Amino acid sequence: MQYSEIMVRYGELSTKGKNRQAFIGRLNGNVTRALHEFPRLTIRPKRDRMHIELNGEPSDQVMARLSQVFGIQNFSPSIAVEKDMDKVHAVALQLMNETAPKGISYKVNTRRSDHDFALDTNAMNLDLGDYLTDKRPDLVVKMHQPDMILRVEVRREAIYLSTKTIQGAGGLPVGTAGKAALMLSGGIDSPVAGYYALKRGVDIEMVHFFSPPYTSQQALNKAKQLTAKLTPYVGRIYFIEVPFTEIQEEIKAKVPEGYLMTVQRRLMLRLTEAIAQQRGDLAIFNGESVGQVASQTLESMAAINDVTTMPIIRPVATMDKNEIIAEAEKIDTYDLSIMPFEDCCTIFAPPSPKTRPKTDRARYYESKIDVAGLMDRALAGVKIQEIKSSDQFMNQDQDVIAELL
């Protein structure tokens, strides 16, 4: 079936009142970026719907991209027909023949923005219903919860017919909730946290700590590839690489083993906050889940959060590990996340870290190191890269990956 357009229905935008136009404008920009590889498209955002005219572009490929754009409740591929009922009948029958299996139930549902058209909504429903009953007597008309709905939109320029409704990604358009930094470790949890942040309309930047020679180039490439996995939802994400070797070595030399992880996480948070403030980010997201590891007990979180007043948001905080894994598989980050390249959270990890560290002790041990100097040197070495969904960082690592797996 050659579709003419895709009709997009908004998600939570319907609740946004006076901000509705700003949300629609942001969604229009996000959709335009997501579909930039299809130059013949015409995108027309309206108050209650968005219409994407295909102009010969492949509908399946366009819909696959569209399904990853947050802020969309659902969408329907549609066929434009001249406002001639004989032609509408013919296309409606063709559409039902191609999409409606024998014996299913259906109803006709008409919306009319062109009130000058000869038939009103009820008359249109009856006209098409009678025609289809005559041509497809195997179909059963059912007004409540039918198997299929033939949707009809009567607009000024044409009549649009559709039988498919495809679920969108939901959520809010990315960027409508502001911008934040995400602490990306390379494990399973933080990419899922990033996905949830994007879904709530937050434009995220990835902050990744890199400690050569203790962490490898493969570990860095893995973190970049995880970022690329999330970019289809937003178009591009900035990846901020923070050198952390000197800080880790200094902490290992001067801080008791039980507090290594706590002080290390405090420095990570200090650096993330500094970067966030420089770049206008309003909050910090991470992949912490309460009680999952020693640094994620409530006592540990309190001792670590002590260094910042910036909001710390933990989207997966109350999820079980199996729930996080299921979401990682759904967004296609799980297989990457479990590749066994050490990151800076695992090197120097003590065998028995404090699970209930005291904030005053953490402050005391942190005072033994030159926090300001270490941070200045780390921030001076920060590298920032814009990552897009088409970027590939793991290709050169295939032989290494094959050996590991």
From Swiss-Prot:
Residues 60-165 form the THUMP domain. Pathway: Cofactor biosynthesis; thiamine diphosphate biosynthesis. InterPro entries: Rossmann-like_a/b/a_fold, ThiI_AANH, ThiI_fer, ThiI_N, THUMP_dom, THUMP_ThiI, tRNA_STrfase, tRNA_sulfurtransferase_ThiI. ATP binds at residues 183-184, 208-209, 265, 287, 296. It is an enzyme of class 2 (transferase). One of its GO terms (biological process) is thiamine biosynthetic process. The keyword Chloroplast does not apply. It is found in: Cytoplasm. GO terms for molecular function: ATP binding; CCA tRNA nucleotidyltransferase activity; tRNA binding; tRNA-uracil-4 sulfurtransferase activity. It catalyses: [ThiI sulfur-carrier protein]-S-sulfanyl-L-cysteine + a uridine in tRNA + 2 reduced [2Fe-2S]-[ferredoxin] + ATP + H(+) = [ThiI sulfur-carrier protein]-L-cysteine + a 4-thiouridine in tRNA + 2 oxidized [2Fe-2S]-[ferredoxin] + AMP + diphosphate; [ThiS sulfur-carrier protein]-C-terminal Gly-Gly-AMP + S-sulfanyl-L-cysteinyl-[cysteine desulfurase] + AH2 = [ThiS sulfur-carrier protein]-C-terminal-Gly-aminoethanethioate + L-cysteinyl-[cysteine desulfurase] + A + AMP + 2 H(+). CDD domains: PPase_ThiI, THUMP_ThiI. One of its GO terms (cellular component) is cytosol. Its main location: cytoplasm. Transmembrane segments: none annotated. Keywords: ATP-binding, Cytoplasm, Nucleotide-binding, RNA-binding, Thiamine biosynthesis, Transferase, tRNA-binding. Its EC number is 2.8.1.4. PANTHER family: TRNA SULFURTRANSFERASE. Catalyzes the ATP-dependent transfer of a sulfur to tRNA to produce 4-thiouridine in position 8 of tRNAs, which functions as a near-UV photosensor. Also catalyzes the transfer of sulfur to the sulfur carrier protein ThiS, forming ThiS-thiocarboxylate. This is a step in the synthesis of thiazole, in the thiamine biosynthesis pathway. The sulfur is donated as persulfide by IscS. Belongs to the ThiI family. This is Probable tRNA sulfurtransferase. It comes from Lacticaseibacillus casei (strain BL23) (Lactobacillus casei). The gene is thiI.
